[in-house]
């Protein structure tokens, strides 16, 4: 977040914004850039999709116990390098798999559920009844909830096996997963680089095929940016599409439970299970839930121009200053590919776009300062003794909370203080209204909007940890979507130079509220025709 005076200037100086400006998109080439090829041996480690797992169980080729053993074996081989998980529930996963096999034998596969035998990683800010839930913070070290988050419960009811809790930046506040109170997760494409954040553990776990799919949360890009960095599919649903019950609150008006998969099909399958109204969350929507997977068209049934008649706007402000040249090239080549599939692609200007970042950090920090006041060392988590209650509170929070969390609490408290509320918080809310209006107008003209998911590919561990402004600038592509409450899908679209096999780049697709089905359909067509999902990180060939 910019310093207070700089943020104030940005927020006070905005003027009435015109409707989005459009100009014809010009591609940099006629063909999408060729992804960097990983070694052929990686094919032997190709991940099992949800569909292939189900087919294996149905045919009797493999049991749930055998599938679980295979994933746990890969997890044990790769975890020392990747460090995706804070807690691995291997014994519990093996027991659940054996119980699934017994149920399949007696009741049949359909009775067990559509996710039978599918191993899921769960971001550690989602509550799980049978394993620790820390939020990535030492202040909750050892805390074990008495209940499952609604999204977790729905996965279990569908037959999924939770293999463990994935690492994250503390309470979701960060973009690299370096801010975890427990360990630093690495990127499976290059273990000297960050996986993104805050859901870096969930993204790296799917990328390294330590689990089939995973859950994350997205407050300002925490699913989409790590999906781009790790070369997997990441979905941020519409605000209210998935229940937040059991999610440790960071910024309640922005937080969304999302998911990762190695393909759009797997991601769509997970969304169908976790989406829907929940009486335990007053902000959850009663909007109808589709069978998102059934709406996807396989490659052999696609028309020659499957996106014919579709209008796509590429956000002009996301292709300028501060965005790496290789990322811009990959996104423009992806847009060119969308044109080849029959769509009309034009650049569109969203004049409020640059105001979103400072507004986001004011609003998110303000909400965090309230939400995190519950962690006081009394009811659960780390406690530091003191001579009186104030010393106990202060000592517990000072020792249990990390630097980034404390900094955002201070910023939020400052923005909400009596003398500065109108100058910061109220003005940020006004900017949020402008952002919503800007997206609404653009999406009345276009079926979807596209942009990079991040201004760069994965960077070196430690490169930005001491430069908060550079770190926050990495959220430029994603925070506006949270401010507007819109759904967004990230699909791998190419590679830039770096590491031994290149570094992935993700294309962000943004839609109108509750248009997840359309995003997944377009993303599936794009993915199949590029087939990026078949490329896996070098780590798997080496493990």
From Swiss-Prot:
PROSITE patterns with a match to the protein in the record: AMIDASES
- GO terms assigned for molecular function: ATP binding; glutaminyl-tRNA synthase (glutamine-hydrolyzing) activity; hydrolase activity, acting on carbon-nitrogen (but not peptide) bonds, in linear amides
Catalytic residues, chain numbering: 123, 198, 222
Query: What's the top EC group for this one?
Result: ligase
Q: Which UniProt keywords apply?
A: ATP-binding, Chloroplast, Ligase, Mitochondrion, Nucleotide-binding, Plastid, Protein biosynthesis
- Catalysed reactions, semicolon-separated: L-glutamyl-tRNA(Gln) + L-glutamine + ATP + H2O = L-glutaminyl-tRNA(Gln) + L-glutamate + ADP + phosphate + H(+)
Q: Tell me which GO cellular component terms the UniProt record holds.
A: chloroplast stroma; glutamyl-tRNA(Gln) amidotransferase complex; mitochondrion
Documented EC number(s)? 6.3.5.7
Q: What's a Pfam family in this record?
A: Amidase
The GO annotation for biological process reads: glutaminyl-tRNAGln biosynthesis via transamidation; mitochondrial translation
Q: Where in the cell is it found?
A: Mitochondrion; Plastid, Chloroplast stroma
Matching InterPro entries: Amidase (IPR000120), Amidase_CS (IPR020556), Amidase_dom (IPR023631), AS_sf (IPR036928), GatA (IPR004412)
Q: What is its main location?
A: mitochondrion
Q: Which family does it belong to?
A: Belongs to the amidase family. GatA subfamily.
Biological function: Allows the formation of correctly charged Gln-tRNA(Gln) through the transamidation of misacylated Glu-tRNA(Gln) in chloroplasts and mitochondria. The reaction takes place in the presence of glutamine and ATP through an activated gamma-phospho-Glu-tRNA(Gln).
Query: What NCBIfam families does the annotation carry?
Result: gatA
List other remarks.
This protein may be expected to contain an N-terminal transit peptide but none has been predicted.
Q: What binding partners and quaternary form does the record give?
A: Subunit of the heterotrimeric GatCAB amidotransferase (AdT) complex, composed of A, B and C subunits.
Listed name of the protein: Glutamyl-tRNA(Gln) amidotransferase subunit A, chloroplastic/mitochondrial
Organism from which the protein derives: Oryza sativa subsp. indica (Rice)
Q: Which gene encodes it?
A: GATA
